Amino acid sequence: MELRVGNRYRLGRKIGSGSFGDIYLGTDITTGEEVAIKLECVKTKHPQLHIESKIYKMMQGGVGIPTIKWCGAEGDYNVMVMELLGPSLEDLFNFCSRKFSLKTVLLLADQMISRIEYIHSKNFIHRDVKPDNFLMGLGKKGNLVYIIDFGLAKKYRDARTHQHIPYRENKNLTGTARYASINTHLGIEQSRRDDLESLGYVLMYFNLGSLPWQGLKAATKRQKYERISEKKMSTPIEVLCKGYPSEFATYLNFCRSLRFDDKPDYSYLRQLFRNLFHRQGFSYDYVFDWNMLKFGGAREDPERDRRDREERIRQGRIPLPRVMLPTSSGRPRGTQEVAPAPPLTPDSHTGMERERKVSMRLHRGAPVNVSSSDLTGRQDCSRISTSQAHSRVPSGLQSAVPR
């Protein structure tokens, strides 16, 4: 039996989950296009999918915003069908052994600042800026950074008058503690400055491999947040950014200097990193670290990789991996800090053998429904049969969808 949503999208296997929704691979039966289908039980205590889909719709048309194809209800489930995307930056960070080159960090920073600026221009703040919420596109959009997960987004000003929300204190921490701004830790209402400060921590995370306040232990969630806050506030920006170009410290100092309702100078921040990019002699060829690892670990010879990549493009081969779907976390308010991702230690292969196998998979174009754990070499998933896919679909949806 064939399961459909919106009488157009065939439901496939489950490929991700969040705190208030599961994500399935789907297929548009009219065009054959693969899509991501997010389901949320209508009986959930705090429904979020309808709100999130409305925000996505307000963002439609922006560069790096996933296309929403259909929203509605099927049986016991709220449904959102959206464009299928590639791996998250967190997945790619793990694939690259938890270290990005300066060139890759700067290429990402330029696009990430623009995504945040666009969201702000639409009168919203994201409030959960982290590597998991930035995904790469697929195919021709493989070099494009997308921003996802508006489950915690909030309107910060009136759309017509641009009246800013009032300054408030004693707010609970919203977002992910690892990347939260200092003002967020202090209980101050979030605004545009906080999204950008969080991005600064993400960039240093990419540079360093981890942040000084990761891995702290505490008896309770509140105590852990306090320990993270104390470590963050006691670590001077210059110490955090030591050994890296001064632009990273300049960026964070600028963000922390903004007042609550200030409009950030996004162009200034982008130009900071663009000037550094040019001084380093880098080329805007959009060859990221994972592209070089993908084709046999040619990290030492970027010029050869560029020539190989151009040859693949001339031959009509897709230059980027199709490795997974968007893993929108859908994390509810008060998201907990998560532990650092484990090191890449395969169960039965050496690191070199694992990298070779992953590179070979990417070289031949891994299917889009491969899980993120497969990307890091932990397991080898293949497409499941139709009967298996159906067995994973909630029964409330099975009874509601036309056979």
Curated annotation (Swiss-Prot):
Name the catalytic site residues.
128
Q: Which organism is it from?
A: Danio rerio (Zebrafish)
Q: What is this protein called?
A: Casein kinase I isoform delta-A
PTM note:
Autophosphorylated on serine and threonine residues.
Per the record, the similarity remark reads: Belongs to the protein kinase superfamily.
CC annotations in GO: cytoplasm; nucleus; spindle microtubule
Residues bound to ATP = 15-23, 38
> In the UniProt record, what gene is named as encoding this protein?
csnk1da
Query: Alphabetically, which GO biological process terms does the record hold?
Result: endocytosis; non-motile cilium assembly; positive regulation of canonical Wnt signaling pathway; positive regulation of proteasomal ubiquitin-dependent protein catabolic process; regulation of circadian rhythm; signal transduction; spindle assembly; Wnt signaling pathway
Q: What is the lineage of its organism?
A: Eukaryota, Metazoa, Chordata, Craniata, Vertebrata
